[in-house]
């Protein structure tokens, strides 16, 4: 079982890694992570969602100039989609 601290730091590390620059998370970002944790979003879903959001961003960035991603909220929809996919996959295997 992942402890409270690791859930936050793993998400922070992945976001910083995918962004390509050190960016301290804001208090709103930390609150979003807390919301995910309280909602039972698995760490794997959060990390997959961050990766998916940045994959889409990078694909679009090749076509048009886009602003830098400055906050974790930009990944929120992809995290929720990844969590739903994990739930559906778990339901099929149950």
Model-predicted regions and their roles:
Residues 1-94:
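Intrinsically disordered, low-complexity, basic-enriched segments
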